[in-house]
Swiss-Prot record:
Cofactor requirements of the protein: [4Fe-4S] cluster
Coiled coil: none
GO aspect biological process, one term: light-independent chlorophyll biosynthetic process
Protein family per UniProt: Belongs to the BchN/ChlN family.
Protein name: Light-independent protochlorophyllide reductase subunit N
Organism classification: Bacteria, Bacillati, Cyanobacteriota, Cyanophyceae, Synechococcales
Organism: Prochlorococcus marinus (strain MIT 9303)
Length: 418
């Protein structure tokens, strides 16, 4: 970490909306409903991002703030109560209702915490009403999940039982595989937040060891720590090496013999390295520039350099929690330039000056850079893909090899046409 160059800049940012997290959260908890309190733009965003037609009755919706609400000419609280009551009457299977704040609701200072408290009193436990902010005014698009999980922590029952808690949404199949591995290591009690049913919350207490699966869950980690849980320091489970160190941190916390851990994990590492080999041939020596958007940038940079041989031009990150990222920063190569914050115009100037082989960025920047013949990878695609764990390392590498292969094909076509 001492040899990593930590820089900071501020200015205009290119960001994506935190409401996007609803897309993966509503799939995770089928008995929950996410009601965005926002504008028609919010409604269009969520419907488009989820790829679900509204007549399919998805588990999310928008209570639209009209001009009268924004101008203060109507009682938004009264209208919201009506919308919630109509929703619950039509969808009796809902067990947890999330009221999700947006940029418009925050601008007019709509107090959703007070609304949730009032509705909980009216519903008397039949449906739990929680609230969090999905606004993108001062946050990244991944922080919506952090807000949702933080809202759930106070409802978790107390327990002194020794247990491992995996925090952060992963693909169900990937999570099942990881839980099976932890059981083989000798950790029998493993639970998850968020759970697969919103009312089936895991317990928490002094005996709880927490492994974060995502690097953007800062507020949730703080809440769990306040409940007595221990947050284990480890790299994040991206790539074979990071996933192994992540699991070894849990094994060490539970006093499991290192030789037993190696017996379980070593065959998986051998298989992962074999699967990674063809992608490493494509990626080794290529130069990559990671622009700040998802907060996955530092773990991805570690994986791409150490396991795929890529050169790191710049690693941008929206916010840098040094305590949470310590294990990751220590694994970056000497003199890696880590840039916290963003001045998007200056960063684009550096991209054009450096001409990297690949840029990881938001969707709004990808097409302009592609037009300048710079290959790009959408950072949001990494959130929606099952990339956690040793077995997924090759799939993760393929996500970065694919745009380079596409760029090579385009260049070859241009040469042929000329």
């Amino acid at each position: 970490m001492g040899s990593t160059t930590l820089l900071k800049e501020s200015g205009p940012r290119e960001v994506f909306c935190g409401l996007t997290s609803i897309v993966w959260l509503h799939r995770r908890m089928p008995d929950a409903f996410f009601l965005v309190v926002g504008s028609r733009t919010c409604a269009h965003l969520i419907q488009s991002a989820a790829g679900v037609m509204i007549f399919a009755e998805p588990r999310f919706g928008t209570a639209i703030l009209e001009e009268r609400d924004l101008a203060g000419l109507a009682d938004a609280h009264e209208e919201l109560d009506r919308v919630v009551n109509d929703l619950l009457a039509r969808r009796p299977e809902i067990r947890t209702l999330f009221l999700v704040g947006s940029c418009p609701s925050e601008v007019i200072k709509l107090d959703l915490a007070r609304v949730a408290e009032r509705l909980n009193g009216q519903l008397q436990g039949g449906v739990r009403v929680l609230n969090y902010s999905g606004s993108g005014i001062e946050t990244t698009f991944t922080q919506g999940e952090d807000g949702a999980l933080k809202a759930m922590v106070p409802l978790m029952p107390n327990s002194n039982e020794a247990q491992l808690l995996l925090v952060g949404t992963m693909a169900n199949a990937v999570e099942d595989r990881l839980k099976h591995l932890f059981e083989r290591l000798g950790i029998p009690s493993v639970s998850s937040l968020p759970p697969r049913q919103s009312t089936d919350l895991p317990s928490v207490g002094p005996g709880t060891r927490v492994l974060l699966t995502q690097p953007y869950l800062t507020d949730t980690a703080r809440e769990l720590k306040d409940r007595g849980a221990e947050i284990l320091q480890a790299p994040f489970p991206l790539g074979a090496e990071g996933s192994r160190l992540w699991m070894e941190a849990a094994a060490q916390a539970f006093g499991i013999n290192g030789s037993h851990v190696a017996t379980i994990l070593e065959p998986l590492m051998v298989r992962a390295q074999k699967a990674l080999s063809p992608y490493k041939e494509q990626l080794a020596g290529k130069r990559i520039f990671l622009m700040p958007e998802s907060q996955l940038e530092i773990p991805l940079a570690r994986f791409l350099h150490r396991e795929c041989g890529m050169e790191l031009v710049e690693v941008g990150v929206p916010y840098l929690n040094r305590d949470m990222m310590q294990s990751e920063l220590e694994l970056l190569p000497p003199n890696t330039q880590v840039m916290e914050g963003q001045h998007v115009e200056k960063q684009l100037d550096r991209v054009r000056e450096q001409r990297p082989d690949l840029v990881v960025c938001g969707m709004g920047l990808a097409n302009p850079l592609e037009a300048e013949e710079i290959a790009t990878k959408w950072s949001i695609e990494l959130i929606f893909s099952p990339i956690h764990g040793i077995d997924q390392a090759a799939d993760l590498a393929e996500l970065f090899a694919r745009p380079l292969h596409r760029r090579d094909l385009l260049n070859n076509q241009l040469l042929v046409s000329v």
